[in-house]
Amino acid sequence: MINKPKIAVLCNNRMAVPALQSLHAEGRLCAVGVAEGNTDVIDFCSWLSQSGVPFFIIGKENRSLQIRKMVDTTAADYIFTMTFPWKISTELLHDYPDTFYNFHYGLLPEMRGADPVFESIRSRAKETGITVHAIDEAIDRGAMILKKNIPLTADMTHGSLCTRLSWLGAGLLHELIVLLQSKVKGTLQDEQHAQYFPKPGIADVCISWQKQDAETIEALARACNPWNKGVYTQWNGWNIRIVEATVVHGMASHPGLPGTILSLDKEQGFIVKCNHDTHLRLDIVCTDEGFMSGHKLSAFGLKKGGQLINL
C-alpha cells in the first residue's frame, strides 16, 4: 500500500489558497512557507499554524537554510512551489532529488516567465492552463509532470483567471500525487517552441494609441485588471487608467488621430479612436479621484475632439 505523502508548499499569492485548503483537508499538508513581507498571504495562512501545520516565513537572503530546515523538520516528501518568488538553490535540488515541483500558471514551454496570466490575456491566447514541472537550475525549464489546459474566454480578466487557475491547481493535486508516487519523470520541454516573457514593466501597461488597435487595448485592460487598476493613458498631464473597455464596431471612419475622443456622454459613452481606424468605448476608468464610468470624465474637462496621449 502506498503511504500518504507529506507535502510542503512554498507560496506568495492567493492562487495557492485552494490547493492549501485541499491538501490540509486530506491530511497531506505538512508545512507552509511564505515569502516575507507578504502580509496578506501571511495573515491568511496563519490559520494553518493554529491547526497544527508548521508555518515558515521565508527571507530572500537565508531562504536555503530556512527551506532546508522546513524539509528536515517535517520530513516532507514533496515541496510544491506556487508563485514562490525566488529560485531554489542548486544545493537543495542536489540534496533532495525528485522533491521540488513548481506550479506554473501558464502553458509551457511557450509561456515562460514571471506572469503568464498577464501575457496570456494580453496576447489573446485561445487557451491557458497550469503546467507542473520538476524544478531544475533553469527557470521554468524542468521536465513537465502534468499539464492541464482550459479555454481562455474573451471576457477574462487577470483577477478572474487567477481565481480559475487557483481552483484548477487544487483539482489536479490527486492526479499529480499519483504520478509522483509512480516515479514519473515527466516530459522534456521542446525548446523550439519556448518563449520567455519578463515581468511586465511600465511600457507594458501603457497604451500606445498610434500602434495599438481597439482589440489589443481592450485585452491589455483586462490583463491589468485588477492588479494594476487598469492600463495607463494620459490627458492634459492627468493619468487615467482604463479598467474595462468594449470594442465598438460599425462606426464611421474619422479623420482624427488615434487617441481622439469621438464621444463623451451618457448615451454613447466614452469612445476613442484607436489605430487602424478602430474604436473603443472606455466603460470603467480609474483616476486618483476614484473608479467611475468613463463618460463621467466630462466633469473633469475632457471633451469630444480632445486627445488622449501615451504616458
Model-predicted regions and their roles:
Residues 1-227, 232, 266-267, 274-281, ...:
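One-carbon transfer enzymes
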Residues 224-273:
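C-terminal substrate-binding/catalytic lobe of Rossmann-fold NAD(P)-dependent oxidoreductases
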